[in-house]
């Protein structure tokens, strides 16, 4: 379904990262698999650009991996990746996630070119960036050796699942490092029910009309923006772009003239209220400034009215 040589259902994306790392460190060698996380004598370093460090990259450390950072916060030069790759390098990590790829860092294509020229596999985490459905295929097609995708986010399969797809030899190695084998991935077991549930969800997901889906999300976001009306100091818009907001979002920008509570204060109040409303907020959660962003993917019909009501309650609270 994904156009990959092979694939494996994992116990979520984080478990998929563990198996990615284990496959690149120990391969399919039984003696090495049994030794993890002792990586003595094995390639175990994973090169990653500084802006691509993320909350789950500790998963690479579980089987004994070590992350090697390159670049600055908003810039990476090709020579930095070239110089970082050495005898201990097991892989190059590339994160596809909102607000993590400023224009000055190495692109996916550049990472693939440099890493592959030195015999190093490229590992891609695209867990939170599906839809668009194209992301299921693009990175495998364009050079990734392994790609991890969440089964429970946009695909809407079991929340405890993920998909690890890529080169046949690396998927075989990941499988040998996983349950039911007595290996580093034994604790991250997937049941037959989860596997069937994810495969079924993926089939349904691929059969959906993405254009119509995006239009629904856009309409929901437009309804939220319209419902807010004119709040002095707040600029509400619908945004979508191919990098940072791949789905339509209703975004509230706090203008310099705004004199009310901060975006963070509004976010916390929304989460603590009745009903609980969870929104994205500010740069620490993937954003530009002190804005609030609302993703429509998990909303049911009628939820937008509740969101508008709660937003207005908190924005006008004095």
Each model region followed by its residue ranges:
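Conserved PLP-enzyme active-site core in the AAT-like
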Residues: 3-206, 210, 220, 225-229, ...
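Conserved C-terminal alpha-helix-loop-beta "cap" of PLP-dependent enzymes
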Residues: 227-316
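Shared catalytic-loop signature of beta/alpha-barrel
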Residues: 213-217
